């Protein structure tokens, strides 16, 4: 123990301590391993990558062989339509997770921000473990989301017009004392620029999640291109958007809060049996150790393992 002081560990801290000790031991014992890949820039407009190769000389030999051939044979192209349903409304833990992942806030920071927003009557009660609302709240949420669409300037076609579109957020059995975290109607008239930056960011996450939860699914076409060169397989993946749905809200919020654009890689059509190779490059990588636990991860694991 730090400074050789005894530390009392109760029934709550014991599993957290055990979990942390196991993770730290795994990190301490981890030995990174280098690996190499060969990337081919194809005339079809995409980049295909080889498998991970542990030996550098093998990867270098493959690189030279590809540079000599300068042609890749298309073996197969598979396309599959996929769909991602919108995420549920926020409870405290999922809000803390996203604020940590996107903004670097600790669990306590996020709690402080959302507690302050609640005290200012800008959001509902924050200390909830439910991601749902009850039937009694459905009409309120329906009216609120209509106003939030204009607040975030969301295109109406991105939001689900199913009747009622809020039905997927309703589950009385999963609401205990308090429903999911929502913005309030009074938030729409508030001067949000006067809020501290941390509170502004957390509020934007809550507004965005509220709209995402009632938006259409994200539909896309996933394409996998498999080519062969010098006896080795190379693959490239891409996504073509069919319907952006809730991702439109996520994209807008990420651009606003993080000043970061979210882009998908679409594979161009490769109708020919062969593609020319414009460039072949050797890439070096290294395996990563398990990540250290943060307070947010501990909260998440505690919720997930709760009976």
Language-model features: locations:
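Phosphate-backbone binding and catalysis cores of DNA-processing enzymes
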Residues: 1-81, 175, 179-244
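Polar low-complexity intrinsically disordered regions enriched in Ser/Thr and small residues
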Residues: 48, 248, 276-279
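Structured DNA-binding interfaces in DNA transaction proteins
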Residues: 60-200, 204, 210, 214, ...
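Polybasic, glycine- and aromatic-enriched phosphate-binding surface used to engage nucleic acids
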Residues: 232-264, 270
